[in-house]
Structure formats: structure tokens, C-alpha cells
Design a protein with these regions (language model features):
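Histidine-anchored nucleotide/phosphate-binding helix
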Residues: 64-86, 90, 233, 349-362
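Short, solvent-exposed loop/turn segments at secondary-structure junctions
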Residues: 61-64, 91-94, 224-227, 249-252, ...
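Conserved catalytic-core segment of nucleotide-activated headgroup transferases in glycan assembly
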Residues: 296-376
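A short, glycine/small-residue-rich beta-strand->loop->alpha-helix junction that serves as a flexible
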Residues: 59-69, 221, 338-344
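Conserved nucleotide-sugar donor-interacting segment of glycosyltransferase catalytic cores
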Residues: 203-258
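Short hydrophobic beta-strand segments
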Residues: 49-63, 217-220, 328-332
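Conserved N-terminal ligand/cofactor-binding loop architecture of enzyme catalytic domains
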Residues: 1-58, 76-201, 248-308
Length: 376
């Protein structure tokens, strides 16, 4: 029922989700466990005097798991004597939010997000600043005026105050439109591109002022490639402020963390340090268990394969697979995944790679191509 509603009546689905968050925010008996834990923790006198560093949490994307993770790190830093402050989204970037899809994020989805985050920061007594509070009407007018000067075809080349914002927003627009290539002949695409660029101009100005005023020692954020985070990342880097980016890992309760770069989940920089180190028996057992879990379709954050077919004979019959032929496998990603950013090296695009590969094998009846689609 949940998936049916979300697919066929998204407005009503997100309205119900918003009501659920509203109810569980204020009703003590049915309140989220996370809120109850926050209440208990916030009342304890375990926070030291703020004598160490000042850490800024940039939380433009604040779905529940990200917000919970941020708050755990936030409290851990405060316990160790650090001062923390947070920039959160109060709906300011609804037209350019990566949790939305063309033409903009659903109204009640945005309201649900704001409700949960505002309650979280209220209970935990966060030092919170909302995005819309960081600029005024004049900033909004200026951003519209600046971006309106550019022709549609020139949007990818837009620079503002030395920042290549036309490039920085590309990952977000691909994700927002669920495309691999941005079509500047399409009116809706151009409108969305301009929305992201206008938001970027406002953010660069407001983030610059904020960092100058508060002077954090470090900035902690999700990913670092998507639009709002990318603007904060670049402005902070221009001021030599240390930035830590993170992403949820492939296994449950694991994370990737990166320093002074947008997240890179395919990094081999440290391989030379570990390649000659022999695994212990415990590590070998853990690795064997993990490989077995993956073989069974488990060991992931989401259960992509609740009803996985394991009978090879049935699979081969269904898809006409002939094991006497030489077999080639293709593993495409989602075409708008941020991990594909700037790695179109040998083909014009991710989609072009798939199409050309299929066309090649059409003319090779002695071989067969199996395409394993991304489970998302």
C-alpha cells in the first residue's frame, strides 16, 4: 500500500507522512524513539566547556538517518569540549533540493523534512541557523538579475566570483531530472538549471558572510558534490577551512569520510599501505561471511532482493541464456548517480556506453551479453 500510494498519489502520500511526523513530534507516548533519547541526553550535564574547536555542521539535506548521524557526531564533539553550530534547511531550496525531482520537491515532503529537523534541533538545543535567514530580499533579486544575463546555452559556463557554479550544479541537475545528459533545448531543464544557479549565487554570498562572522575551524557535510553542499565546500576551501565530507557506506552502520574533497567512494589511494598486509583469521572469516552475504543478496543497507531467484535453470530459461556461448556481463549504474561525475572517459555518456555495447553484441550471435541492471 505504501509503495502504491507513493507511486500513484505522491501528494497524498507525503501529506500523510507529514502528519505522521507532526503527530510523533508532540505526542509523548508515540514520540519517535530518537526524540526520547535526545530529551534524556540533552538533560545530562556531560558537555564540557567549549575550549577546543568550533565545528560547523552543514545540513542542507536532512532526511532522518542523516540528521540522526549528524546529531550523534555533534554530541560526541561537544562532550569532548568542542563548540558546534548547524546550518539547516527550512524549505529555502525546495526548487533546488536533491531530495526532489523535476519540477521541484513535493510541498509536504519538504514540510515533513522541516518538521523533523526543527524538532530535532529544538530538543537538542542546537545552535541552529536556517538557510533562509542567511540572506535578504535584495540577495534574491540580485541572484535573479545575475543569472538572467546568461543565454541558455551558456549556463554550464557560468562563473560567479571565481566559482564555476555552472559546473558545480551539474551533478544536482542530473539527479533532479534523473538524466545522464542535460538538454539545454528543453525549457523545463533550462528553468531548473536557472533555479539551481540563482540559489548558488545566494548561497555563495551568504556562506561567505557566515564563515567570516563565525569562523569555524572545520565544516562537516554530506557528500560535497551536490549543489548547496558544493557551494559551502568551495567557499570554505577558499578560506582554508578544513572540510570533512561523508557518505553512508556499502554495509549497514558504516561510513565513508573524506578530508578537503568531495566524497570519493572508489578511491585506491591507500591500497599500497594495505596490499601486502596479510589478513588475520578473524578478518578472513569476516570477509568470507560478507562475500557470502552479498552472494545471497544480503549485507546491504537496503534489502534489494527480498525474493531473489536462485535457481539457475529457471533464470537461464526465463532469459534464454545459453551457457555454451561465450558470455559477457554489463553492470550499468543509475545514469544520474554522483559517482559517475566526470568519469565519461571513453564514451560520450553512460547511456551511450550501454547503447553502443548492445549494438556491438547484436552483430555477434556467437556471443551473448547479460545486462545486470542496478537494483535501485
Amino acid at each position: 500500500m505504501k509503495n502504491f500510494l507513493k507511486k500513484n498519489s505522491s501528494n497524498f502520500f507525503y501529506f500523510l507522512a507529514y502528519l505522521k511526523v507532526k503527530f510523533k513530534s508532540f505526542n509523548g507516548k508515540f514520540q519517535y524513539t530518537f526524540f526520547k533519547q535526545l530529551n534524556l541526553f540533552s538533560k545530562q550535564s556531560i558537555f564540557k566547556n567549549k575550549i577546543n574547536q568550533k565545528i560547523l555542521f552543514f545540513s542542507a539535506r536532512q532526511d532522518k538517518p542523516q540528521l540522526v548521524f549528524n546529531k550523534i557526531i555533534d554530541f560526541a564533539l561537544q562532550v569532548r569540549g568542542n563548540e558546534t553550530l548547524t546550518i539547516g534547511c527550512d524549505g529555502d531550496i525546495r526548487k533546488s533540493c536533491n531530495y526532489g525531482a523535476s519540477p521541484k520537491i513535493d510541498y509536504f515532503s519538504c514540510k515533513e523534512c522541516k518538521e523533523f529537523s526543527s524538532k530535532t534541533h529544538s530538543i537538542s538545543k542546537s545552535n541552529i541557523y536556517w538557510l533562509s535567514e542567511l540572506y535578504n530580499t535584495n540577495d534574491l533579486i540580485e541572484s535573479q538579475k545575475i543569472i538572467s544575463q546568461f543565454d541558455d546555452k551558456d549556463l554550464p559556463s557560468v562563473f560567479y566570483k571565481g566559482y564555476h557554479i555552472g559546473e558545480f550544479v551539474r551533478v544536482s541537475i542530473n539527479h533532479f531530472l534523473k538524466v545522464n545528459k542535460i538538454d539545454l533545448e528543453d525549457n523545463n531543464t533550462v528553468k531548473i538549471y536557472r533555479d539551481f544557479l540563482q540559489a548558488s549565487v545566494r548561497q555563495i554570498n551568504s556562506f561567505d558572510k557566515f564563515l567570516e562572522k563565525h569562523k569555524p575551524d572545520k565544516v562537516f557535510m554530506l557528500n560535497g558534490l551536490f549543489a548547496a553542499e558544493r557551494m559551502m565546500f568551495e567557499v570554505a576551501r577558499s578560506k582554508n577551512i578544513h572540510v570533512i565530507t561523508y557518505e553512508i557506506g556499502y554495509r549497514p552502520e558504516t561510513f565513508f569520510l573524506w578530508h578537503n574533497n568531495p566524497i570519493n567512494m572508489c578511491c585506491n589511494d591507500y591500497w599500497n599501505e594495505f596490499k601486502n598486509i596479510k589478513l588475520s583469521d578473524i578478518q578472513n572469516n569476516k570477509l568470507d561471511k560478507y562475500i557470502d552475504e552479498r552472494y545471497q543478496g544480503k549485507g546491504l543497507i537496503l534489502n534489494y532482493f527480498p525474493n531473489m531467484q536462485k535457481d539457475i535453470s529457471l533464470i537461464s530459461k526465463k532469459f534464454n541464456i545459453d551457457f555454451n556461448k561465450k558470455t559477457f556481463l554489463l553492470f550499468p549504474n543509475l545514469t544520474w548517480d554522483s559517482t559517475l561525475y566526470n568519469i565519461d572517459l571513453f564514451f560520450n555518456s553512460h547511456s551511450n556506453w550501454i547503447v553502443e555495447t548492445i549494438e556491438y553484441f547484436i552483430n555477434r550471435p556467437q556471443d551473448q551479453l547479460i545486462i545486470r541492471c542496478h537494483p535501485s
